Curated annotation (Swiss-Prot):
Gene (name only): rplL
Lineage per the UniProt record: Bacteria, Pseudomonadati, Pseudomonadota, Gammaproteobacteria, Cardiobacteriales
Protein name from the UniProt record: Large ribosomal subunit protein bL12
Entry keywords, A to Z: Ribonucleoprotein, Ribosomal protein
Pfam families referenced in this protein's UniProt entry, alphabetically: Ribosomal_L12 (PF00542), Ribosomal_L12_N (PF16320)
Record's keyword annotation contains Transmembrane helix: no
A single GO cellular-component term on record: cytosolic large ribosomal subunit
Family that this chain belongs to: Belongs to the bacterial ribosomal protein bL12 family.
Length: 122
């Protein structure tokens, strides 16, 4: 009469932890195997995908030759007065807009560059 899987599981469930460890060692020896945990398969894209930024700061890095046009763009974007906008342009590099959406930041950068300034997104 053969012993069923059910009988083996019942016998193991009644064992102490130390008895189970001894059983595992005996099985490893008898069958020439190890009871090591198999490593999880590695996905093809092992590098974690960087989350896309949703908020950008628009930095005016250089005012360029046409400061008047740049000041007009800065005023339109920020709502600053003439004096404050001129100061922001004169003190380049300066942050023109913080936490802007990607679309808004790209539009501001484009407008600044069309006015002759150099800008970057961070």
């Amino acid at each position: 009469m053969a012993i069923s899987k059910e009988d083996i599981l019942n016998a193991i469930s009644e064992m102490t932890v130390m008895e189970i460890v001894d059983l595992i060692s005996a099985m490893e020896e008898k069958f020439g195997v190890t009871a090591a945990v198999a490593a999880a398969p590695v996905a093809a894209d092992a590098a974690p995908a960087a989350e896309e930024k949703t908020e950008f700061d628009v930095i005016l890095t250089e005012a360029g030759a046409n400061k008047v046009a740049v000041i007009k763009v800065v005023r339109a974007v920020t709502g600053l007065g003439l004096k404050e906008a001129k100061a922001a342009v004169d003190e380049a590099p300066s942050t023109i807009k913080e936490a802007a959406s990607k679309e808004e930041a790209e539009k501001i950068k484009k407008d600044l560059e069309e006015a002759g300034a150099k800008a970057e997104l961070k």
